[in-house]
Amino acid sequence: MTYRINPNTGDKVSLLGFGMMRLPTTATGTARENSDAPIDQQAVNEMVDYALAHGVNYFDTSPVYCQGHSEEATGIALSRHPRSSYFIATKLSNFSDAAWPRKESQAMFERSLNYLRTDYVDYLLLHSIGGGARGKDAFETFNARYMDNGILDWLVEQKNTGRIRNLGFSYHGDVRIFDLLLKWHDEGKYHWDFVQIQLNYLDWHYAKRNNPGIPRFANSSYR
């Protein structure tokens, strides 16, 4: 396995990560498409064991993956191994306006820790900035999800206490939001430890926009 060193933390992260969005079920299809069948936990355990045995140590999940069950399945599988042997990436996926209030977003983060069976997250992302919701444009939605409720500042506090080791964001949508967050980083308003973008042979649109001082993670690398 090839690894990259996170310059901020010294983490030795596998070049290939394990996305936990399409976990197998006990029926046909994955838990992303099939909401009726439960996740096949034994199969997930075996997949995680195989990945770790072959050098993969970065596992990416979210509260909304697999009909809301990905984090729990991920936590069950990973907790069977030493905590120091893997890195967990999850997200604040507060897409629904019901999750925008501060207490609801905080509760989402706390549930993530519980499901993942850990007291800290290695990599926490603001999930999919740049999109609109509930008739709001991208800026209004971003403000509702992270700024008006003070949740971004709260996440910074969690990082300062060690409950989040790296704070970043994933991006899809309005590039002006992407540029704004990079500007905040340059101005010292908020420090981003990493960003995650869609990057592959077809999608190179945002590669040059990345700040060279911020570690980059790519999703959808095979398309």
Please identify what each model-predicted range represents:
Residues H81-R102, H127-G130:
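Structural motif corresponding to the early beta-alpha repeats
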Residues I129-R223:
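Beta/alpha (TIM)-barrel catalytic core signal, keyed to glycine-rich beta->alpha loops juxtaposed to Asp/Glu
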Residues Y3-I5, V13-G17, N57-Y58, S85-A89, ...:
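Structural preference for beta-strand elements that scaffold enzyme active sites
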Residues M1-Y3, V48, E71, G75, ...:
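Generic structural signal for well-ordered alpha-helices
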Residues R22-Q42, L92-E104, D137-R145, G173:
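Active-site mouth loops of central-metabolism enzymes
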Residues M21-L23, S62-V64, K91-F95, L126-I129, ...:
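Active-site beta-loop-alpha junctions enriched in small/polar residues
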Residues N34-A51, W100-R117, V175-H185:
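Short, acidic/polar
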Residues M1-Y86, W154:
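N-terminal binding-site loop/beta-alpha segment at the start of enzyme catalytic domains
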